Amino acid sequence: MRINGVLNKAAWALVMTAGAASTQAAQKVCVFDILGASGDAFNMAKDYGLAMQKQGVTLELKAYTNEGVATEDFRAGQCDALLASAFRTRQFNTVSGAIDTLGSTTMIKNGKIDMAASYDVVRKVIQTYASPQAAKLMVQGNYEIGGIFPFGAAYPVINDRSITTVEALAGKKIAAFDHDKAQALMIQRVGGQPVSADISNFAAKFNNGSVDMIAAPSLAYKPLELQKGIGAKGGIARFPIMILTYQLVLNQAKFPAGFGEKSRNHWLGEFDRAMSMIKNADAGIPAAAWIDLPPENAQKYNLMLRESRLDIASKGIYDAQGLKVIKKVRCSMNAADAECTTKSEEG
């Protein structure tokens, strides 16, 4: 009886210890999605959680509709990882954050913007960062990038179709995110008026007429009801200011060694799924809402974005190492481009 009692106590202690270990093993992930737990990003995060469970890591997801709050909760240690737009995650890793920079992934072929090739630049950069050779670049301080996926091109969304040239932007009010200094600099460069905004209110400012233009991906069109701001006179210019990404940041100390690489490879495998979402969103915008720029203007404006990108990088806002990686990918795909004979973005 006594032996049985001791064994029972020992077994109970093991159960309690295992229970405590499993409780400790659950890592919290702050997930920003404008639609909360019903959105595409959160659904992708749920599948990520299931995949990582097979790797021995249990994740507990928390949905946020306010990206700023999600980021601050992560900073404060209330979450062990953060899934959000690169505008927010750039503060934790400037190298991967360089993907979301003015025109950095845009490809011009035969004088026209080639969107398929542009997304291929993003794919190749994500592949590069998922490789073991680039693992060191994905770590800055206590933080590690655990994955990247595309969220679509940021297109100019305007309330008046006469604003289809850079010259016409002079004096126009344009939303600029407070947490991305490059936006205000670019707006000032073209003579526009930057209006302070963030991801939680920029669409409302456009829809109520407080600003004349915003930059947004097609995935935002329906959820943010951008047709209200576009009205009968506005539209969406089919010109990518940049290709946006979502990025996962890990508090490295909270995850087992080697987890970051497994995590990055999972998200690399989600690239095509993300592209399907983007293509569906593009197709869901009424044909009449799109504005096609003349090819010569698109090429001219992309060169302007490049000049702005170089200027902003010289101010230390964009990461030189990250831009170097992206240029290398661009030039591997189109070595004939004039920029590939220059030393710019190679510092």
Annotate the PLM regions.
Residues Y64-S104, V157-R161, I214, S218-I230:
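Pocket-flanking alpha-helical
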Residues E60-E72, D178-K181, Q193-N208:
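Short helix-initiation/N-cap motifs at beta->coil->alpha
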Residues A26-D47:
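Extracytoplasmic "Venus flytrap"
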Residues L50, R75, F87-K173, H179, ...:
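Contiguous mixed-secondary-structure segments that line small-molecule binding/active-site clefts
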Residues K222-F239, T245-N251:
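A beta-strand-loop signature enriched in Asp, Gly, Thr, and Trp
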Residues G49-L59:
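Signal peptide-proximal N-terminal region
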Residues G19-A26:
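Sec/Tat signal peptide C-region and signal peptidase I cleavage site
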Residues M1-W12:
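Bacterial N-terminal signal peptides that target proteins for export
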